[in-house]
């Protein structure tokens, strides 16, 4: 058989409610003393640990960004320096090429002037030698003409003979 006070919802009494509230309050106090504070301590530790990990990660990221910026700067500077070196080398090569061309032109002009000078000197020497030979030939012919009283034909033959001998001497 069922007893009426054991059936749920059969009767509401303030004593039962008060006892339930009192037991609940004691349970809350015990939970707060023995479980809540240690649980909150663990939670606080966890929060601080996570916060320090986040700070460390942000610091690492900031350092990485700074290093990346520095590396980009160094790379850009290296590019600029290499470009400058290339330009300097091109300019130096161009100057050397121009200097070589100028030197070659001066040398060719000098050789050309020497050749002209040699040609002129040889020409003068040849003319001088020819004048001497013509002069001595004229004297020789004149002496032969004086020795022999020649007519025009003999005189022409004599001149031709001396000219041929002169050509053979060379």
From Swiss-Prot:
Q: Where are the annotated coiled coils located?
A: none
- Kindly list the GO CC terms recorded for this protein: plasma membrane; proton-transporting ATP synthase complex
Membrane topology is:
Single-pass membrane protein
Which Gene3D superfamilies has this protein been placed in? F1F0 ATP synthase subunit B, membrane domain
Which regions span the lipid bilayer? 11-31
**Mind telling me which InterPro entries this protein's record contains?**
ATP_synth_B-like_membr_sf (IPR028987), ATP_synth_b/b'su_bac/chlpt (IPR002146), ATP_synth_F0_bsu_bac (IPR005864), ATP_synthase_B_chain (IPR050059)
| Cell location | Cell membrane
Q: Which GO-annotated molecular functions does the record name?
A: proton-transporting ATP synthase activity, rotational mechanism; proton-transporting ATPase activity, rotational mechanism
The main place the protein resides is membrane
- Is Cell membrane among this UniProt entry's keywords? yes
CDD domains, from UniProt? ATP-synt_Fo_b
Entry keyword set: ATP synthesis, Cell membrane, CF(0), Hydrogen ion transport, Ion transport, Membrane, Transmembrane, Transmembrane helix, Transport
Cleaved signal peptide residues: none
- Entry keyword annotation includes Electron transport: no
Lineage, top-rank taxon, reads: Bacteria
Q: Which family does it belong to?
A: Belongs to the ATPase B chain family.
**HAMAP family reported in the protein's UniProt record:** ATP_synth_b_bprime
Q: What does this protein do?
A: F(1)F(0) ATP synthase produces ATP from ADP in the presence of a proton or sodium gradient. F-type ATPases consist of two structural domains, F(1) containing the extramembraneous catalytic core and F(0) containing the membrane proton channel, linked together by a central stalk and a peripheral stalk. During catalysis, ATP synthesis in the catalytic domain of F(1) is coupled via a rotary mechanism of the central stalk subunits to proton translocation.
The subunit structure is: F-type ATPases have 2 components, F(1) - the catalytic core - and F(0) - the membrane proton channel. F(1) has five subunits: alpha(3), beta(3), gamma(1), delta(1), epsilon(1). F(0) has three main subunits: a(1), b(2) and c(10-14). The alpha and beta chains form an alternating ring which encloses part of the gamma chain. F(1) is attached to F(0) by a central stalk formed by the gamma and epsilon chains, while a peripheral stalk is formed by the delta and b chains.
What is this protein's name?
Answer: ATP synthase subunit b
